[in-house]
Amino acid sequence: MPDVPWIEKYRPRKLSEIVNQEQALEKVRAWIESWLHGNPPKKKALLLAGPPGSGKTTTVYALAHEYNFEVIELNASDERTYNKIARYVQAAYTMDIMGKRRKIIFLDEADNIEPSGAPEIAKLIDKARNPIIMAANHYWEVPKEIRDRAELVEYKRLNQRDVISALVRILKREGITVPKEILTEIAKRSSGDLRAAINDLQTIVAGGYEDAKYVLAYRDVEKTVFQSLGMVFSSDNAKRAKLALMNLDMSPDEFLLWVDENIPHMYLKPEEMARAYEAISRADIYLGRAQRTGNYSLWKYAIDMMTAGVAVAGTKKKGFAKFYPPNTLKMLAESKEERSIRDSIIKKIMKEMHMSKLEALETMKILRTIFENNLDLAAHFTVFLELTEKEVEFLAGKEKAGTIWGKTLSIRRRIKETEKIEEKAVEEKVEEEEAEEEEEEERKEEEKPKAEKKKGKQVTLFDFIKKN
């Protein structure tokens, strides 16, 4: 495969080169030009919403090239904490030292912003001095505080004709011919995702047309985790198994839990099961190193081990395969918002109780039992951990959450009363010390004339003796 990915090599450098999004681009131009004319729009953020591969990210970079902006790109999936995002945004408030280039702050995957951090990011948007552009596949999954402050620009899904035309233009520039039926199949399987179609085309051209059936057979942009597991456990072909995580909306560490849970249900012989567990053990080591060092290129080796490594471990059971969700997290039953709330609770436990993530996870399970059975104690934990109403509801359920929240109000009121008493005591102490200092000063002032008078009497006595 060529060194340079075609998706980057042939990325449009002008807005006019973007495929079939004229209506959206018209709004984008009007918005950015209001910044350039010194009259920032009322909504200082722009939200590009639409399906994958429709041109959202390409729009940002074409816009920057055409209007001479520098892009500072962040990803909500990676830079989730407010402090990190705030640091980048703060750094971008001013222009370069020479003042030649302005900056566009680009936050990709805005539909992955944690709800707990949304209010603070909204404040950053309010005080922004540079354009902020966000991209999301699902508009309604962007937190409301962010949506309310952003101008919405909707991108439509590209049709097969649009995708094929773009692929043909690339092939002409490469001087390559590909059978029409393969181009049609690529466009069909892409579901309007031009980025995915270009990647598939480059893979097929590099590997030969005999690989086309494998690449295209597993192209499913909305693939579920069950389909991904099927690709790992129903194949003994390492090359095909590696495609399991392609376009799956799940991190490698989460997918590893699913693979781990299902190995006992899929393998017949103990020695084969052991080989599969050895593969995911190595994957876990790579993931841990990536997390500790920040070197996420190690993910590639982890993914290879948890997919290809497991696939070639031995003979799987024949027939229909029923897959099971991980018991530890029960991720199947949780929506993305619920996972976000769960992660927020775990972080608060780690911070306030000085625990590791694993310890915090176990503690959260205990807290769930407490919140379901001891509402008074639950209220105290709520105040101690500074839990939100949604987090209380996550731990206790809707019926009990309201009662617990009501109890926290009285606890907070008592805390405030105690704080007021303590503040008053401190103030009284300060006033008492100040009064004592004033009395001491007054006493010193009163003693000065006496000392001087005494000194005067000594001189007079000396003179008297001298005279006599």
From Swiss-Prot:
Span list, region Disordered: 422-456
GO molecular function, one term: ATP hydrolysis activity
Residue stretches of biased makeup (Acidic residues): 429-444
Pfam families the UniProt entry points to: AAA, RCF1-5-like_lid
GO biological process, alphabetically ordered: DNA replication
Keywords, alphabetical: ATP-binding, DNA replication, Nucleotide-binding
Domain of life: Archaea
InterPro entries: AAA+_ATPase, ATPase_AAA_core, P-loop_NTPase, Rep_factor-C_lsu, RFC_lid
Ligand binding (ATP): G50, P51, P52, G53, S54, G55, K56, T57
Record function comment: Part of the RFC clamp loader complex which loads the PCNA sliding clamp onto DNA.
NCBIfam families: PRK04195.1-2, PRK04195.1-5
Quaternary organization: Heteromultimer composed of small subunits (RfcS) and large subunits (RfcL).
Record family assignment: Belongs to the activator 1 small subunits family. RfcL subfamily.
Protein's name in the database: Replication factor C large subunit
Species in which this protein is naturally found: Pyrococcus horikoshii (strain ATCC 700860 / DSM 12428 / JCM 9974 / NBRC 100139 / OT-3)
Gene designation per UniProt: rfcL
